[in-house]
Amino acid sequence: ILPIETGIIHSYKVAAVNKGGISFPSEIVSVYRSPKGEKDKTVLIVNGFDRISGPASFESTADSLAGFLYAVDRGVPYLNDIAFIGDQFEFRRSATWNSNDNNGHGDSYNNYAGQVIAGNTFDYPFIHGQAMAETGYSFVSCSHKSLAEGVVKPDTYPIIDLILGKQRQPVITPVLQDTLRSYLAQGGNLLVSGTNLFSDSWGNAQDRTFVEEVLKGKLASRNASKEGIVNSCASPYGYINGRYTFRTRPNPICYSIESVDGVLPADKLAHTILRYPENNIGAGIVYEGKYRTCSLGFPFEALQTPSERNRLMESILRFFSIQQQNKIQYIQ
C-alpha cells in the first residue's frame, strides 16, 4: 500500500517494462485525503472517458465529395496533436493540386499550424479532484472498467463522479448501468457529465431507459450550444448559481467541444439548474428523490478556469450533502 500524505493530491500511472522496452502508460488515477478527515466526505471519481478517435468523415459518390467534418466531431487525439493545421474547406474530389497556395482536394485552413492541440490526457480524475479538494472533500478514483467489473466496490462512497468527456457509443456500458442502478437504489449520489450522454443514448432502448428512469432526464437537443456559455437558472436550488464557460476551440490545455447535449427533466422531482443562454436550452438537471443525481450535458473538466470548476463543484457537492428543509413526500 502506497503512503498517502494528507493535504496533497497523489497521482499514479502504470507501465510495463521488459527487454523490448516500455509500454504505453495506463490512465492516471488520483487520490486525496482532506486534512478535515471526514469519512462521509470521500468521493469516488470514475473515469469513463478513454476514447481515442480521428475526426468525423464522410464520403459521397453521388457528387464526388469527401472529407473531414470537424464541426461535427474533431475526434480525440492521444494526449495531443501536433499535425493538425486547420479545418478542411475543399471537399471536391475533382479539385486538383495547382500550387502550394491552391492544394486541391483536402485543402484546409492554416490557422492552427505549429500549435499543440490537446487531446485525451487521461488525467481527468485529478482535475475533478482538485475542485473537490478545494471544497474540503477527500477522493479516490478508478477506471470505469474497475467499477463495472466489481474490482472497486461503490457502496462505501456517498458520492460517485462519473467522467464521460467526449465518450461515444456506448457512453455507459450495460454492465456499468447495472452497477450504478444498484448503487443509487441504496440511496447513493451520482454526478455525471459529458457531451454525448443523452444524444448517444437516445437511439438505444436500453441506454435510453437508463437515462430516463435512473438519471431522470431526456434529450432536448443534440447540438445545444455553439458559444460555450452556461448560466444558472431559477430552480429550488438557489445556491447552484453563476456563469460558466467551456472550451469550444482547439487549444493546448483541454480537448475542445464541438457539440453538447441539451437536457430536460423526465420526472416531477427533477429540475433544470443550468441553461445555455444563446437558446435557453437546459444544460444541466438534478433529481432529488430516494437518491440524488446531477447530470450535465457538457464535460465538467472542459470548463475554462479552476475558479469556475471550484464554484460549480462546490454547489453540486452541497446539493448532495445538505438535507432539504422541506422533506419530499414519496409516493409509493
Write out the residue ranges for each language-model feature.
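Beta-strand-rich modules
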Residues: 2-20
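Surface-exposed coil/turn segments at beta-strand junctions on protein surfaces, enriched
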Residues: 3-7, 185, 289
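Extracellular fibronectin type III
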Residues: 17-39
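Low-complexity, Pro/Ser/Thr- and charge-rich linker/hinge segments at domain boundaries
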Residues: 31-53
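Short, solvent-exposed loop/turn elements at domain surfaces
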Residues: 51-57, 141, 200, 281-283, ...
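Helical hinge/lid and interdomain linker segments adjacent to catalytic or ligand-binding clefts
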Residues: 81-208
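A glycine-rich, often tryptophan-bearing local segment used as a flexible ligand/cofactor-contacting loop or short
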Residues: 165-259, 312
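Catalytic beta-strand/loop cores that center a nucleophilic Ser/Cys/Thr
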Residues: 222-306
